[in-house]
UniProtKB/Swiss-Prot annotation:
Belongs to the class-II aminoacyl-tRNA synthetase family. Phe-tRNA synthetase alpha subunit type 1 subfamily. This is Phenylalanine--tRNA ligase alpha subunit. CDD domains: PheRS_alpha_core (cd00496). It is found in: Cytoplasm. Its main location: cytoplasm. It holds the Pfam family Phe_tRNA-synt_N. GO terms for biological process: phenylalanyl-tRNA aminoacylation. NCBIfam families: pheS. It comes from Hamiltonella defensa subsp. Acyrthosiphon pisum (strain 5AT). Keywords: Aminoacyl-tRNA synthetase, ATP-binding, Cytoplasm, Ligase, Magnesium, Metal-binding, Nucleotide-binding, Protein biosynthesis.
Length: 327
């Protein structure tokens, strides 16, 4: 029982003759598995006397250790031989040209936002941001939008409950900024806004840039000059513009601004007006001392005009063929 020399020699021969790791693994299982040779030897110890068991156990353990070492060594050898065969069969032609890297680029909406921000920062405006999940106070009430206004309905606004909603405009950022900083101030607020609408020229989510100046002695002439200079900067040429009377609850008087396209048609690009006194009063700002103007523009609309895009949905479809044109 204590002489395992033939057993060990046979194991060494089997391990040496193994031609791959799969065959070697079968040998390992035959010796060390639950029903393997060593399990049989260990079970036979119970047949020996108490005095002989320790010596026999040491012999078995030494055999296990030796066979395990041979298995490990043979496995490393087989793996090295396999790697050498693979390397010799996989010839790399270093003369082949390398693959060209695909460089990414900024999205046209991002480019448009940066372009607008560049102008207004030079004019002393700061860039502010606010929550996209807004409350009715900042999205409607503080903006002089009455409770019966159609913009509050579920047909136009995504409501979570009676108070929380996805903001329909970034004007709420202006309200928060006026509360936090007070006049005088110059601020623009770019960001995502949400409305119930989806067609060739509308999407449920789009980007908007709103701006506000609040100071003493601000007039409509200041508003007109600011926006005309901006449009000339943005389109890189002096386009004919017109200011049409309009209505917005948060400005009085209000106007919409059109530019003339190359085919001689007028195209609306933004809305604007003088800040309504009710808004200033609501924020405890004296409308007799302070006045201001506000404006808002759709980023995608300006991008469509600037880049000649005809379908608004192209900005959100992530078609690489479309996006790579703006690198």
């Amino acid at each position: 029982m204590t002489d395992l020399s033939d057993f060990v020699a046979n194991a060494q021969k089997e391990i040496k003759n193994a031609q791959n790791t799969e065959a070697l693994d079968l040998i390992r299982v035959s010796y060390f598995g639950k029903k393997g040779h060593f399990s049989t030897h260990m079970a036979s110890l119970s047949q020996l006397s108490v005095e002989d068991r320790p010596a026999a156990g040491r012999v078995i353990n030494q055999a296990k250790k030796q066979i395990q070492q041979w298995l490990d060594t043979r496995k490393k050898t087989l793996q090295s031989e396999l790697l050498a065969r693979r390397l010799s069969s996989e010839i790399i032609d270093v003369s082949l040209p390398g693959r060209r890297l695909q460089h990414g680029g900024l999205h046209p909406v991002t480019l448009t936002i940066q372009r607008i921000e560049c102008f207004f920062k030079k004019w002393g405006f700061s860039v502010e941001s606010g929550p996209e999940i807004e409350d009715s106070e900042h999205n409607f009430d503080a903006l002089n939008i009455p409770s019966h206004h159609p913009a509050r309905t579920e047909q136009d606004t995504f409501w979570f409950d009676s108070e929380r909603l996805l903001r329909t405009q970034t004007s709420g950022v202006q309200i928060r900024t006026m509360k936090k900083k007070g006049p005088p101030l110059r601020v623009i607020a770019p960001g995502r806004v949400y409305r119930h609408d989806y067609d060739q020229t509308h999407t449920p989510m789009f980007h908007q840039m709103e701006g506000l100046i609040l100071d003493s002695d601000i007039s409509f002439a200041n508003l007109k000059n600011t926006l005309q200079c901006f449009l000339q900067y943005f389109f890189q040429k002096e386009l004919p513009t017109r200011f049409r009377p309009s209505y917005f609850p948060f400005t009085e008087p209000s106007a919409e601004v059109d530019v003339m396209t190359q085919n001689g048609e007028w195209l609306e690009v933004l809305g604007c007006g003088m800040v309504h006194p009710n808004i200033l009063t609501h924020l405890n700002i004296d409308p007799e001392h302070y006045s201001g103007f506000a404006f808002g523009m759709g980023i995608e609309r300006l991008a469509m005009i600037a880049y000649g895009v005809t379908d608004l949905r192209a900005f959100f479809e992530n078609d690489v063929r479309f996006l790579k044109q703006f690198k």
